[in-house]
Amino acid sequence: MDVETKYALLKENIKNYGKIAVAYSGGLDSTFLLKVCHDVLGDNVIAVSIRTDLQPVREYLGSEEFVKKEGIKHFILKFNDYTLPCFKNNPPDRCYYCKKEILLRIINVAANEGITTIVDGSNMDDLCDYRPGRRALTELHIKSPLLEAGMTKKDIRVLSQKLGLYTWNKLSPACMASRFPYGTAITPERIAMLNKAEQVIADLGFTQFRVRLHDEVARIEVIND
């Protein structure tokens, strides 16, 4: 299918949902999804965002302004991943536990608004990577409209640009927990240290980089833009 056919299918699928809550991170995928859902369903859409220390502040700058401009009802919840014993020990499937807890909170907010359908921004590209968090989506019956319409990251960028979304060329961020090797304890102090280091690099003008922690050694990865 070409991108316009996928776009038409996406809107048709969304129309059938009726009333929905969008898991909104402020990134490329969820911003595009939220925009299309709102265009199709209007006030039958709410956005629910989760703020954690594992998401650098710079990654969601602009998201609250976007939602306000669109006139979408927006809920923001604070969640401390460190409270999950199965997460802070950093096992290979940590994303599953974290994702499930986050989704349960979103489901609770949606239920209070009389909404039973939750959607997220997963797309075709997500099927190519190791994504233990997808198990949580399946278990909790979360819908992925972009995936159902066969949309790739490239499709989403093209359509986001056409819609004039500020996120159309935004890079996909990686959770701060990914900066640690499996089995390395994730603590608030270590996350704060990495956030500070990455902000210094961002202030220098770099956009594609990671600071990874290996015991007491920090490794900086930078990609030429």
Cite the ranges covered by each PLM segment.
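Conserved beta-strand segments that form the floor/walls of ligand-binding pockets within enzyme
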Residues: 23, 175, 221
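A broad detector of the eukaryotic-type serine/threonine protein kinase catalytic domain
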Residues: 19, 95, 181, 223-225
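Mid-to-C-terminal catalytic subdomains of enzymes
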Residues: 120, 147-201, 205-215
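ATP-dependent adenylation/nucleotidyltransferase module used to activate substrates
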Residues: 1-162, 203, 218
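Short, aliphatic-rich beta-strand segments
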Residues: 46, 213-224
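Acidic-residue sensor for enzyme active/binding pockets
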Residues: 59, 198, 221
